């Protein structure tokens, strides 16, 4: 897969941008979380802030929203 941008690796994952949207990859460049986010920040304490459909939220490493 080609990425137009890759963020900093943190806790084994990095945010990466595909053609338009962001997802998360591991150090082998394998997709771990789908490329569906408008914004994606690095993980910190197993939580990352993402933007989806104009909404800011926090997700865990499984992609589930955290409150």
Residue ranges and their predicted role:
Residues 1-67:
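Residue-level detector of conserved, function-critical positions
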